[in-house]
Amino acid sequence: MSNMVEIDGSFGEGGGQIIRTALSLAIMTGHAVGITNVRARRTKPGLQPQHLAAVRAAAAVCDARLAGDSVGSRALTFEPQTTAKAGNYRFDIGTAGAAPLVVQTVLLPLTQAAGASTVTVTGGTHVPHSPTVEYLEAVYVPLLRRAGLDVTLSYTNAGFYPRGGGQMDLVIQASTGPKPLVMNERGRLEELRAFIITSNLPEHVAERGAVTVERSMKAVGRKIIIERRERPSPGTGAAAVIVARCQQGMAAFSAIGELRKPMEKVAEAPCREFMQWWKSTAACDKHLADQLVLPLSFATGLSHWTTPVVTEHLRTVLWVVRQFLSIDVELEEHEDGSGAVSLSPA
């Protein structure tokens, strides 16, 4: 076992992203990791059930020894005993905890396994403070595939707060590692798509969402494909997602329905975020900018991408990666808040 990497969980954004990134890196490098001050900057610090689900999922992939793996724990030790093992995995978060975040914790390590793996995660697919499953399906996974990783994702049931019960299914093939990606500029807009997702709601709710999107996106001057998705779910819920696919760049914007929040308001929110991004020159949205760091840290050459905003999440994930890997990192920050990331092997 390699020397333990010590991570201060209060660094930067001080939330669950530090835990998930460190777990993935521990599996992929073989280093044990000790995390203190877990989620120190959150109103409820320490491990919560959805973070514990990510810890247990990561441990299953590499037979890790664990200490501090309990709800409320503010210190965690994770010691991989093997490299990532191919297998058929099922992880049940048991709540409306974010299934996409558990997926992102184990996905990249399993591309290093000796064979193909299947992963099924049940929990929340459309919940606050997490990518939606459509975000992974339409942006994150396609970019992994562009980088040469063989990953497919589908989902049947949607999971909304508080019931959860959504299901995501992945097939992950073994890979020799990602190729670098360069997204200096977004290039020509090739496809604009909207997803209107509803579960156990009257048909007019989805219709109102679609009408709102069509009206709100007229200023772009491009045809938008609107796909309505009625998904089975233990509870009720709605979401709207806007996806832009360009020659180089990609971006997506999501909003989740809430009790007594009209569908028009839900659908307007991602349209408004898209328009803000569209006025910038960035190739990626601000969330994709930090989600690309982990996979492209293992790429064989120089990767470069631009972001409309340099977020604390981006600074934090770059810091965590540098605790494990010897890579050259350059983060440009401009006066207007936008920036660019460059990563390459040292």
Task: Indicate where each model-derived feature is located.
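N-terminal basic/disordered segments at the start of proteins
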Residues: 3-29
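A generic, well-ordered mixed alpha/beta core segment in the N-terminal half of proteins
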Residues: 52-152, 169
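C-terminal functional modules
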Residues: 307-346
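Flexible, glycine/charged-enriched surface loops at secondary-structure junctions
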Residues: 65-69, 116-117, 148-158, 217-235, ...
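Conserved mixed alpha/beta catalytic, RNA-binding, or beta-rich assembly cores of soluble enzyme
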Residues: 129, 146, 178-180, 185-286, ...
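Phosphate/diphosphate-binding glycine-rich loops and adjacent basic-rich segments that engage nucleotide
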Residues: 84-87, 92-96, 112, 139, ...
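Beta-rich nucleic-acid/ligand-interaction surfaces
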Residues: 128-131, 155-169, 228-237
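Glycine-rich phosphate/pyrophosphate-binding loops
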Residues: 29-46, 116-120, 155
